[in-house]
């Protein structure tokens, strides 16, 4: 078989094999996320899982306070509408109104304070600890306003708040 004939056969086979592939779409009414992976996960809880697949699935389900734009590397609002550094160890967040969790619970400062204070307690065993061991606590300043108190200056705070630190409902 000549190279040209081999290439033509290969190309035709590839087109046939991929021409009948369709994208998976979830129905709006079934509230189910189907994901195919090659192993069983111990958990899809973002804070008790270190498997890459679990982290990817978690990112499909949960959001953080901030989002880092991959093109500009700018930290943008996500569950927070804005943030400001009060000093080198204190960040305040104004939170987005009108957000609901998957369980129908309204998102507010109680959820952020619950999540961040739960994670600040080493007894709860969040993995990996380096993602969450850099703050002391979170305080509720209003229904949609939160203060995060850091242990010391932490230049990567916004990166962590836009990545591995996601917010859970307090129920």
Regions found by a protein language model. Give the residues of each.
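Bacterial N-terminal signal peptides that target proteins for export
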Residues: 2-10
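C-terminal segment of classical bacterial N-terminal signal peptides
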Residues: 17-25
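Immediate post-signal peptide segment of exported/extracytoplasmic ligand-binding proteins
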Residues: 25-34
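N-terminal lobe/hinge region of extracytoplasmic solute-binding protein
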Residues: 36-87, 117
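Solvent-exposed coil/turn segments that connect beta secondary-structure elements
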Residues: 38-41, 49, 70-71, 88-89, ...
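Extracytoplasmic/secreted proteins, especially bacterial periplasmic and envelope-associated proteins
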Residues: 56, 60, 74, 78, ...
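Aromatic- and charge-enriched surface segment that lines or borders ligand/interaction sites
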Residues: 81-125, 141, 147
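Surface-exposed binding/hinge segments that line
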Residues: 84, 130-171
């Amino acid at each position: 078989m000549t190279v040209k004939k081999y290439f033509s056969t290969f190309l035709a086979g590839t087109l046939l094999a991929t021409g009948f592939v369709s994208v998976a779409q979830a129905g709006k009414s079934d509230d189910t996320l189907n994901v195919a992976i090659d192993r069983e996960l111990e958990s899809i809880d973002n804070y008790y899982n270190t498997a890459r697949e679990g982290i990817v699935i978690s990112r499909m389900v949960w959001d953080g306070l901030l989002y880092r734009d991959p093109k500009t590397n700018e930290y943008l609002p996500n569950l927070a509408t804005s943030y400001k550094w009060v000093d080198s160890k204190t960040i305040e967040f104004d939170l987005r109104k009108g957000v609901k969790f998957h369980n129908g619970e309204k998102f507010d400062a109680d959820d952020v304070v619950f999540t961040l204070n739960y994670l600040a307690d080493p007894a709860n065993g969040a993995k990996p600890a380096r993602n969450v061991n850099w703050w002391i606590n979170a305080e509720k300043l209003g229904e949609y306003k939160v203060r995060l108190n850091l242990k010391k200056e932490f230049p990567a705070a916004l990166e962590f708040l836009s990545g591995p630190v996601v917010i859970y409902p307090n129920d």
